[in-house]
């Protein structure tokens, strides 16, 4: 069994406290987490009885006007302006009067956007020096996985990680989260966000959420708009489907009646709405994800799927995955709500605290340099058998 007590609580008590800061994209999150030191852990074993207690989970999102994305420099400015306020709120909500009682400060090292990541690491270094608390550098993707495992209690699932910057099918083996399949170009969240910009729909609370709401309003669900479907073995491509549906949307707005996918050849009557496009886009993208996830489940002989990442909040994706799992013996789908699917600080605290308890801490600030490219399978998962 894994010994999770290589480092004892700094307070000498029966629990560990971790503060996590996430800021790899347009969401800035600060969370505080407590791990109890149960009797079985004192003997060196790890089980799901080690229930993490979430003391605070604060988040603020940098939102741009409809039709616009977010630039790294502007996002970084947002994070710098808000990080102190969020940390203070998190400490108050957690009931921590003296931050020196924290065992560890965890921050996102990557992957993500360079400037926002740098804003977060500067804040983490500053707090570490002010309060004399050690640092742990966390892989953003590992944070999503470990938070999902903790909340859902999924034992050893195939993980579908779907977000604005990542699309991966992952399974655990020999102390690594192995990537079985992934996008060959853009991530699914990026595909949805860019189509939302084409439609000029609001970015509040998020473009993907607003596309989901439009898709629910589709009245022609028995008639999909034909779109590219690109699955290559265990990998998939979404740039072609985005280019095609962007072209359709522009023809719809221009009322290009020569596009017979959208308008009746004889009468010129509009056949397709924006809601139809959103619905068809979701159905095609999610079908591709379900296909490669099922293939991974068959390969590793698993009957569980854990969906993590911001797009994992999508109810339709969860429904389609559940439908696939029902056709497999004892198939199960695990997912969390928007508190934990969307980027947050507490997921960084969870993964970081597991690393800390295994003795993985930053020994020098040179180890805190952030990186925009940080693969999920680069991390040695010492806290699992």
From Swiss-Prot:
Protein's UniProt keywords contain Flavoprotein: no
Main location: cytoplasm
One cellular component term from this protein's GO annotations in UniProt: cytoplasm
Transmembrane segments annotated in the record for this chain: none
Record GO terms (molecular function): chromatin DNA binding; metal ion binding; N(6)-L-threonylcarbamoyladenine synthase activity; nucleotidase activity
Swiss-Prot/TrEMBL catalytic activity: L-threonylcarbamoyladenylate + adenosine(37) in tRNA = N(6)-L-threonylcarbamoyladenosine(37) in tRNA + AMP + H(+)
Keyword Repressor (UniProt): no
Keywords from the UniProt entry: Activator, Acyltransferase, Cytoplasm, Metal-binding, Nucleus, Transcription, Transcription regulation, Transferase, tRNA processing
List of residues binding a divalent metal cation: 140, 144, 161, 343
Pfam families assigned: TsaD
Annotated residues for binding of substrate: 161-165, 193, 208, 212, 314
Cofactor(s) named in the record: a divalent metal cation
Broad EC category: transferase
GO BP term (any one): telomere maintenance via recombination
Subcellular location per the Swiss-Prot or TrEMBL entry: Cytoplasm; Nucleus
Cofactor: binding details: Binds 1 divalent metal cation per subunit.
Top-level taxon of the source organism: Eukaryota
Quaternary context: Component of the EKC/KEOPS complex composed of at least BUD32, CGI121, GON7, KAE1 and PCC1; the whole complex dimerizes.
Family to which the UniProt record says this protein belongs: Belongs to the KAE1 / TsaD family.
Function: Component of the EKC/KEOPS complex that is required for the formation of a threonylcarbamoyl group on adenosine at position 37 (t(6)A37) in tRNAs that read codons beginning with adenine. The complex is probably involved in the transfer of the threonylcarbamoyl moiety of threonylcarbamoyl-AMP (TC-AMP) to the N6 group of A37. KAE1 likely plays a direct catalytic role in this reaction, but requires other protein(s) of the complex to fulfill this activity. The EKC/KEOPS complex also promotes both telomere uncapping and telomere elongation.
The protein's name in its UniProt record: tRNA N6-adenosine threonylcarbamoyltransferase
Organism name: Eremothecium gossypii (strain ATCC 10895 / CBS 109.51 / FGSC 9923 / NRRL Y-1056) (Yeast)
């Amino acid at each position: 069994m894994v010994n999770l007590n290589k480092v004892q609580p700094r307070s000498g008590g029966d629990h560990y406290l971790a503060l996590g800061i996430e800021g790899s994209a347009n969401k800035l999150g600060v969370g505080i987490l407590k791990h109890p030191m149960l009797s079985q852990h004192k003997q060196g074993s790890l089980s799901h009885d080690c229930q993490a207690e979430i003391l605070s989970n604060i988040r603020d999102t940098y939102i741009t006007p409809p039709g616009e994305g977010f630039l790294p420099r502007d996002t970084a400015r947002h994070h710098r302006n808000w990080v102190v306020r969020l940390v203070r709120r998190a400490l108050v909500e957690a009931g921590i009067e003296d931050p020196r009682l924290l065992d560890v400060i965890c921050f996102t090292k990557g992957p993500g956007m360079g400037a926002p990541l740098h804003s977060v690491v500067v804040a983490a270094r500053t707090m570490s020096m002010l309060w004399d608390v050690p640092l742990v550098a966390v892989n953003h993707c590992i944070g999503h996985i470990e938070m999902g495992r903790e909340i859902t209690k999924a034992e050893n699932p195939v993980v579908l990680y779907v977000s604005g910057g990542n699309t991966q099918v992952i399974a655990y083996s020999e102390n690594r989260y192995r990537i079985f399949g992934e996008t060959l170009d853009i991530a699914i969240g990026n595909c949805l966000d860019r189509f939302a910009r084409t439609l000029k729909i609001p970015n509040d609370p998020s473009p993907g959420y607003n596309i989901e709401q439009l898709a629910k309003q589709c009245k022609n669900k028995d008639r999909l708009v034909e779109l590219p479907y690109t699955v290559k073995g265990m990998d998939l491509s979404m740039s072609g489907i985005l280019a095609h549906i962007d072209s359709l949307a522009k023809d719809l707005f221009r009322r290009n009646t020569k596009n017979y996918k959208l308008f009746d050849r004889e009468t010129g009557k509009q056949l397709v709405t924006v809601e139809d496009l959103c619905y068809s886009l979701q159905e095609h993208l999610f079908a591709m994800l379900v296909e490669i996830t099922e293939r991974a489940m068959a390969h590793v002989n698993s009957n569980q799927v854990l969906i993590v990442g911001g797009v994992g909040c999508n109810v339709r994706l969860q429904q389609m995955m559940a439908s696939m799992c029902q056709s497999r013996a004892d198939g199960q789908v695990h997912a969390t709500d928007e508190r934990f699917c969307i980027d947050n600080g507490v997921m960084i605290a969870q993964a970081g605290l597991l690393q800390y308890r295994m003795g993985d801490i930053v020994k020098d600030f040179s180890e805190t340099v952030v990186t925009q490219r940080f693969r999920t399978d680069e991390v040695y998962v010492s806290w699992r058998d």
